[in-house]
């Protein structure tokens, strides 16, 4: 009874703690925070205490532009915690930001979405980070399950649903039926690998060095996973490695398609393996109803077309794919209240 009473007054949070972005969904309010998973840490002298200089958008602006005493860090790598201290500081900052007036409210229950490939140690680190950031109770849910719920798939029915969640650090492929994950796999390929591939292509073919932010802009503006009818172009500047000075050059969408071949092949093969290993009845459900793409990577132009051509199965990009996992986590919190926490692990 007391738990229920406290739950009425605290803002329950669903957190999609991503490699690229952190999203927070609050019950009854929707997505209230969508910020880059970046923290700027200041340390004035060796051995002096570290302090947080900026978090989120402000810190992302600093990537590659910081003086010696400030380091802009991305504490999540491949979907899991790479820097425990910085992740906890980032979560504290974000939870404080959305859980205002906490003087009157009890600390929130927090549901965190974790990659299917996360080990027990990595899950415990995520759980302890959330507790250290002020959570009263922590639930963990696997990302593909949250993505499927957020995309509106019938996860509780005796029918196979396939979700491909392409985040910043990982791509999670899962087949879901009767509130359970029947098959899941995680490959460490995502939006970051796309950016890396573009940086490497430019270095190899233009002898120029570009930063992460420029690579991301190229990906968003002219990136494509399948040859299109029109060829788009973009003007960029990078540091010429031979001359050591900035130089401008033009890239087109066909070049970026070529640059992205390796990571795209990895995603396609992960999907093919999932289809091969799926039980026959569920495979027939999927071939009839298709698969759903979620996550920021699903926004890459023509990715649905590529997967459709390679698998021969209908592919749909979820509505607002970037927020699917966080929204699904929010719905899952409501399911906890109705059915108890059997969908989720508290450890």
Curated annotation (Swiss-Prot):
Requires ATP hydrolysis for polymerization. Polymerization is inhibited by toxins CbtA and CptA, as well as by A22 ([S-(3,4-dichlorobenzyl)isothiourea)] all of which cause cell rounding and eventual death. Inhibition by toxin CbtA is neutralized by cytoskeleton bundling-enhancing protein CbeA, inhibition by toxin CptA is neutralized by antitoxin CptB, while inhibition by A22 can be neutralized by overexpression of CbeA. The keyword Cytoplasm applies. One of its GO terms (molecular function) is ATP binding. InterPro entries: ATPase_NBD (IPR043129), MreB (IPR004753), MreB_MamK-like (IPR056546). One of its GO terms (biological process) is regulation of chromosome segregation. ATP binds at residues 19-21, 168-170, 216-219, 296-299. Disruption phenotype: Depletion results in enlarged, spherical cells. The keyword Plastid does not apply. It is found in: Cytoplasm. Keywords: ATP-binding, Cell shape, Cytoplasm, Nucleotide-binding. One of its GO terms (cellular component) is plasma membrane. Pfam families: MreB_Mbl. Forms membrane-associated dynamic filaments that are essential for cell shape determination. Acts by regulating cell wall synthesis and cell elongation, and thus cell shape. A feedback loop between cell geometry and MreB localization maintains elongated cell shape by targeting cell wall growth to regions of negative cell wall curvature. Filaments rotate around the cell circumference in concert with the cell wall synthesis enzymes. The process is driven by the cell wall synthesis machinery and does not depend on MreB polymerization. Belongs to the FtsA/MreB family. PANTHER family: CELL SHAPE-DETERMINING PROTEIN MREB (PTHR42749:SF1). HAMAP family: MreB. NCBIfam families: mreB (TIGR00904), PRK13927.1 (NF010539). Forms polymers in the presence of ATP or GTP. Forms an essential membrane-bound complex with MreC and MreD. Interacts directly with MreC but not with MreD. Interacts with FtsZ, toxins CbtA and CptA, and cytoskeleton bundling-enhancing protein CbeA. This is Cell shape-determining protein MreB.
